[in-house]
Amino acid sequence: EYIKTPNIDQMAREGMMFTDFHSNGSVSSPTRCGLLTGRYQQRAGLEKVLLVPRDDKDKEVGLQSEEITFAKILGDNGYRTALIGKWHLGYLQKHHPMNFGFQKFVGFKSGNVDYQSHRNRYGDVDWWDGLEMKNMPGYTTTLLTTLSEDYIKENKDKPFCLYIAHAAPHSPMQGPNEKAIRTEATLEGDKNSDQIRKFIKIW
């Protein structure tokens, strides 16, 4: 009741309702692993949150190459597939989302980035366009929404699967303005969800 999400609430009313749905994990990486593969995280080798690695041993942890994602299945059946946003399932190129069925990837590999500079907790740029690290200007939430709209527009005449993994409301808690201002308790992600929903209706 405290945080208003009228647009997400509307999507829930108008969409499919799951009455018995469980998350396989309580934190990011294992949950994403389960969502994408349909398997328990222990079976896919991701039992904890992946932090930005600083030694070689930690770099090897990530989604294993034999895992099959829903993106791979859909891509094999004629769908265009894209991930726009957060990956958080491994940092090496062998863990890259484009090796797991996503034909397009724009976003970041780590758990969170600065919303303005797109740098990770160590100050390194973590913004990818395909297989290339390539920073883009813009506030992360707005940028991911705009990129998603562009993808929908480009693929409106063919079957596609767009997995939008927004950064919001993950830390760091940063708004789109330079100054921190007090606003009505409405999630930034709610506004962007509505923007995408309205955009889909147009097309």
Set out the residue ranges of the language-model regions.
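Formylglycine-dependent sulfatase
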Residues: 1-203
